[in-house]
């Protein structure tokens, strides 16, 4: 006798245009609510009460300048539930306090996890290995570290990125000014992973296109391919000879080549996520104190490192009063950074 679980299992895994599955119970509601919350916030909701900013289409922003802003610093790490003590069930007040940000961040995180579980589930049903899901763990790690773990290490959700294009750019400048993020080795590994992955992708695609078998008469080489054909569609031997002539070494194993293409960007993103967890704890890296001391003592000595530190000071001094108006920062002229050349 089949129970309700088996009946539900059959329905969830039924062959349909968009597969649902058990993962869909988490994925579809969370993705719908996160995207819907973002579209609602960017269309109607102001950031006047949290950041002193206009951030919606209703206020005159465009696609690049709208955002769903983080809650005010005074909210701390409250989940800002609609029925919580801050909003007390008042939807308008909840939006004004920044409740949409926590709503989107949490539903977005669970939506991404649901998408990874979807890849696990379908891989199991189709009978393939789960490397797609493993690879997707990298962007999830970056999202969770940047949007959740970093602000949890700071004083409030206020210091997380707001959900918007220009808002993310502001956050990048904040990370540079307050953490010297570009000199952090974990960021360097992240850049190497992303750019290295792009390079590998371009090289691989070009090499395959270069070595396609001439097995059709059409103007387009794409027409000669059949997804059910048994034979190879390009010559690995020719590709190997081509790169052997250029570099002296080349991949001779397709499985190792494709694992390497998986490994480079995924490892880079994971390293970057680990670095952001370090920033959540205000860890520092690569402070070249000897250069700083010499630059302070010798007016003629300056390096790109010491110049960048001055730029960071400038970001902090000019950004903090704008970015954190609730602190009422006032920096007198004499504390603003001056380079040795000045």
Curated annotation (Swiss-Prot):
It is a multi-pass membrane protein. Its EC number is 1.10.3.9. The chain crosses the membrane at residues 30-50, 114-130, 142-155, 197-217, 268-284. SUPFAM superfamilies: Bacterial photosystem II reaction centre, L and M subunits (SSF81483). GO terms for biological process: photosynthetic electron transport in photosystem II. Pheophytin a binds at residues 119, 132. Residues 51-113, 156-196, 285-342 are lumenal. One of its GO terms (molecular function) is metal ion binding. It catalyses: 2 a plastoquinone + 4 hnu + 2 H2O = 2 a plastoquinol + O2. Its main location: membrane. It is found in: Cellular thylakoid membrane. Residues 1-29, 131-141, 218-267 are cytoplasmic. A plastoquinone binds at residues 204, 251. Chlorophyll a PD2 binds at residue 187. Keywords: Chlorophyll, Chromophore, Electron transport, Iron, Magnesium, Membrane, Metal-binding, Oxidoreductase, Photosynthesis, Photosystem II, Thylakoid, Transmembrane, Transmembrane helix, Transport. One of its GO terms (cellular component) is photosystem II. The D1/D2 heterodimer binds P680, chlorophylls that are the primary electron donor of PSII, and subsequent electron acceptors. It shares a non-heme iron and each subunit binds pheophytin, quinone, additional chlorophylls, carotenoids and lipids. There is also a Cl(-1) ion associated with D1 and D2, which is required for oxygen evolution. The PSII complex binds additional chlorophylls, carotenoids and specific lipids. Pfam families: Photo_RC. PSII is composed of 1 copy each of membrane proteins PsbA, PsbB, PsbC, PsbD, PsbE, PsbF, PsbH, PsbI, PsbJ, PsbK, PsbL, PsbM, PsbT, PsbX, PsbY, PsbZ, Psb30/Ycf12, peripheral proteins PsbO, CyanoQ (PsbQ), PsbU, PsbV and a large number of cofactors. It forms dimeric complexes. Belongs to the reaction center PufL/M/PsbA/D family. 2 of the reaction center chlorophylls (ChlD1 and ChlD2) are entirely coordinated by water. This is Photosystem II D2 protein. It comes from Thermostichus vulcanus (Synechococcus vulcanus).
């Amino acid at each position: 006798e089949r129970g309700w679980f088996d009946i539900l299992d059959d329905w969830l895994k039924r062959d349909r245009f968009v597969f649902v599955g058990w993962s869909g119970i988490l994925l579809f509601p969370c993705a719908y609510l996160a995207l819907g919350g973002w579209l609602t916030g960017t269309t109607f909701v102001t950031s006047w009460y949290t950041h002193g900013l206009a951030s919606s289409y209703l206020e005159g922003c465009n696609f690049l300048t709208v955002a769903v802003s983080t809650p005010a610093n005074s909210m701390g790490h409250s989940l800002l539930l609609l029925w919580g003590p801050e909003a007390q069930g008042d939807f308008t007040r909840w939006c004004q306090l920044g409740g949409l940000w926590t709503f989107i961040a949490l539903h977005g995180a669970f939506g991404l996890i649901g998408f990874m579980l979807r890849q696990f589930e379908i891989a199991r049903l189709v009978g393939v290995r789960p490397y797609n899901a493993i690879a997707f763990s990298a962007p999830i790690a970056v999202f969770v570290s940047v949007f959740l773990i970093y602000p949890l290490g700071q004083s409030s959700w206020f210091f997380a990125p707001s959900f918007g294009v220009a808002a993310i750019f502001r956050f990048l400048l904040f990370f540079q000014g307050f953490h010297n993020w570009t000199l952090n080795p974990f960021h360097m590994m992240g850049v190497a992973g992303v750019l290295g992955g792009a390079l590998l992708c371009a090289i691989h695609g070009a090499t395959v296109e270069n070595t396609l078998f001439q097995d059709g008469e059409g103007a387009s080489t794409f027409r000669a391919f059949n997804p059910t054909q048994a034979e190879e569609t390009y010559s690995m031997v020719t590709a190997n000879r081509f790169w052997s002539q250029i570099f002296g070494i080349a991949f001779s194993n397709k499985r190792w080549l494709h694992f390497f293409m998986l490994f480079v960007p995924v490892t880079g993103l994971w390293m970057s996520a680990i670095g952001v967890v370090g920033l959540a704890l205000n860890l520092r890296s690569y402070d070249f104190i000897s250069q700083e001391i010499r630059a302070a003592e010798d007016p003629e000595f300056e390096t790109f490192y010491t110049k960048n530190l001055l730029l960071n000071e400038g970001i902090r001094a000019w950004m903090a009063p704008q970015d954190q108006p609730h602190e009422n920062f006032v920096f007198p002229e004499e504390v603003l950074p001056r380079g040795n050349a000045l």
